[in-house]
């Protein structure tokens, strides 16, 4: 579990306290959690990870054979009543249809926001609270808009990026940077989406409409999320990000 709140920044370095390692952040696994997953692998047939956090974390461990995690579910902070629904999801009584509302990167330090946070204690202010501050400098490139724009412009393959030593080493290419993109989500069934009609107008004051047919191609009932993105053209030298989310709709149970 991880907690976070307005005005409460997350530590960039936990400075090793017996369960953590120097250089690790609050949004990485600590030693207790790693040992627990190793125990689960050695003593149980299946390991399912529940992410009880409101923030995106580093979850590259899902790809590791060391822990053999078979499934992972981000549950946010559901509360006591919400956990009843979580039980139904992991047992298959209910089919999940949620989608991520943020980009989950393998390494937090590949996100520019990582470098805009620090503490505000002066060198001679030993009695002052060591509160952290965040300097907002990203402009419009927040969340998925940064990652998708950087990919569209080739930044993740450029020497400026690949030559930089990030917290967890070096990375190159979108697939090595982004583990789960904005809007990602799985289901116990599969779906097919097909655009059957579109009414697209280039006039800025007109509405555009796209009709999508959703077909459940699996054997379990479920809901699908239709997501519409666009890459708008540059106009009047206005700053522009690569991909814009323009709409989403969830289907009925099919």
Set out the residue ranges of the language-model regions.
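C-terminal non-catalytic regions of proteins with extracellular/luminal or membrane-system context
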Residues: 1-254
């Amino acid at each position: 579990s991880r907690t976070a709140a307005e005005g409460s920044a997350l530590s960039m370095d936990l400075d090793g306290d017996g369960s953590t390692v120097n250089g690790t952040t609050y949004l990485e696994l600590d030693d207790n959690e790693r040992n627990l997953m190793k125990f689960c692998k050695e003593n149980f047939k299946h390991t399912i990870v529940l992410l009880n956090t409101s923030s995106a974390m580093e979850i590259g461990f899902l790809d590791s054979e060391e822990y053999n995690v078979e499934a992972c579910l981000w549950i946010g902070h559901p509360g006591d009543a919400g956990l009843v629904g979580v039980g139904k999801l992991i047992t298959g009584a209910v089919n999940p249809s949620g989608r991520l509302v943020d980009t989950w990167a393998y390494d937090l330090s590949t996100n520019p926001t990582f470098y805009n946070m620090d503490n505000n204690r002066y060198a001679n202010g030993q009695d002052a609270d060591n509160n952290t501050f965040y300097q907002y400098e990203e402009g419009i490139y927040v969340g998925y808009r940064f990652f998708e724009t950087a990919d569209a412009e080739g930044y993740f393959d450029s020497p400026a990026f690949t030559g930089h030593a990030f917290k967890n080493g070096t990375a190159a290419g979108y697939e090595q940077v982004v583990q789960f993109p904005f809007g990602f989500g799985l289901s116990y069934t599969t779906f097919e989406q097909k655009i059957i009609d579109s009414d697209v107008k280039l006039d800025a004051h007109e509405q555009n409409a796209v009709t999508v047919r959703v077909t459940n191609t699996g054997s379990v009932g479920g809901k699908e999320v239709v997501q519409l993105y666009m890459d708008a053209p540059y106009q009047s030298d206005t700053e522009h990000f690569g991909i814009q989310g323009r709409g989403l709709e969830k289907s009925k149970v099919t």
